[in-house]
Each structure stands twice: as C-alpha cells, then as structure tokens.
Amino acid sequence: MKEAKCERQRHEGKIPNEMGHSIVRVQTQQTGEFLSMVVNTVNDYLNQTTLESLQAELPIEKGYCCDVLSTLRRMTVFCEGGADACRRLLMQEPFQEARAEKTLYNVYHQCIEEFFMPKKDTWCENSRASYTGGSAIEFYHAVPASLEQLLLPLSAAFLKMREELAHYEASGSSMAPIRQP
C-alpha cells in the first residue's frame, strides 16, 4: 500500500524519480562548471586590462570602454553568484531538485540573457549567428582585438549553455518555462 502511494506521488511530481533527479543534478554540475570557467576567464582579462591599455590598442571612446569593462564586471558578479549557488546545491544531501531548478532558471536569466543583452547595451546578440556560423554578438563600436578574443569564444560557450538550459526545460522538468511564446 505504501509503495502504491509513493508511486502515485512520484507520478504527480511530488517525489522526483531517480532518473529525473540525476538529470537535474548533472545539469547543475555542468552549469556550475561553465559559470566558474566564465568567471576565471573574464577575471584573468580584467586583472590584466586597464582603460588606458584598451585605448592604446585601439583609440575608441572612453565612455564606451568604461561601459564595456563595467558590463564585464557585472557579468562576473552574476556568474560567480550562480556558480556558488550550484556548488552549494551539489554539496547538500539529499539533493534539492526544486531549488536546483529555480537556480538554473535564475542562471539563465541573470547570466545567460545578461550576456546576450547587457544592461548598458555595450553589444547585442546577432540572432542570425547560429545560421551563418558567425559571432553571436555584435559590438556597437569597433573594439580592441583583445576584447574580441575574450568575448567571441565566450559567446559560443554561452550559446551552448543557453541551448542546454532550454533543452533541460523542454525535457519534462517542472522548471518554470524559460522562453515565453
């Protein structure tokens, strides 16, 4: 009788099954690793870059340079928070699937979407990139080569992670819909 009750609750989504549980856990781990990679990569760049070094590389407007660096710092803060949340979730036993799904949802909106549509409009998403094989982001002004070398590979990684999270949402989890029709 007890097994039938548990099976009914599992079917209603009140108790996660082992397969779904492991999918959420793996996605949380992959997302945390991705965010840590982003933080390390961007921090390495920011630790070696100054406003003067960017302008020496390519004479561009000081305000735009400041906005780009500010956007990178903001992105790093969000990604660091997301990586920390994923790490804490993975250490907890039992694994809290509902909290993990909410964390993945927040990562999507605070990190992934912020990368493609930064608050300060320092660059924008090239929506045709997936069809043309080009860069996923376009700058509003010419930028130094070092900045392109940082962001263009990151854009491919962000595209992949966005697809992973959208695929995860579409694979039957109870996570809130990521993309609104």
Where are these regions (language model features)?
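Long, low-complexity or tandemly repetitive, helically biased scaffold regions used
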Residues: 1-181
